[in-house]
């Protein structure tokens, strides 16, 4: 895409309702973690990817995701995590997509469609 798009993936959820002993975003679905699925869907659309991780799990997220993303410590609430991630995005980005790692099966086609609508001036 020609425009500068950033994507925030909220992954700081604890996963308590899932009964997992690790953050929800690190739970595996088929062959990859939820956050890996989310990153792979958004990577073709966004030039900057920021993932929020629960405090104490940042290194595990970095090991799973590698250098293609920026991992930051999330906040107590989802809104805190998004605010912290927004503060990391340089001013020259035109669009910011906000996605939840737990919604890991959203497609690249959907993300491209959202950006295309934003470019046209639509709200998304």
Residue ranges and their predicted role:
Residues 1-3, 22, 30, 67, ...:
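Residue-level preference for short coil/turn positions at secondary-structure junctions
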Residues 2-56:
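N-terminal glycine-rich phosphate-binding loop and ensuing alpha1 helix
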Residues 17, 57-59, 103-105:
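Short, active-site-adjacent cap segments at secondary-structure transitions
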Residues 20-23, 40, 62-64, 109-111:
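Short amphipathic alpha-helical segments
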Residues 23, 73, 98-102:
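Conserved short-loop catalytic and cofactor-binding motifs
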Residues 26, 71, 123-124:
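Conserved beta-strand scaffold positions in the cores of enzyme catalytic domains, especially
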Residues 35-94:
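Conserved N-terminal catalytic core of the sugar/cofactor nucleotidyltransferase
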Residues 78-124:
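Conserved beta-loop-beta/alpha segment of the NTase-like Rossmann-fold superfamily
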């Amino acid at each position: 895409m020609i425009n500068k798009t950033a994507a925030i993936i909220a992954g700081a959820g604890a996963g308590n309702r899932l009964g997992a002993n690790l953050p929800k975003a690190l739970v595996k679905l088929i062959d990859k973690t939820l956050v890996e699925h989310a990153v792979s869907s958004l990577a073709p659309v966004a030039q900057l990817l920021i993932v929020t991780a629960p405090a104490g799990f940042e290194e595990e997220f970095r090991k799973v995701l590698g250098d293609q993303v920026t991992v930051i410590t999330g906040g107590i609430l989802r809104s805190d995590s998004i605010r912290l991630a927004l503060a990391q995005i340089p001013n020259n980005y035109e669009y910011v997509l906000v996605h939840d790692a737990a919604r890991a099966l959203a497609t690249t086609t959907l993300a491209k469609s959202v950006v295309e609508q934003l470019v046209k001036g639509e709200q998304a």
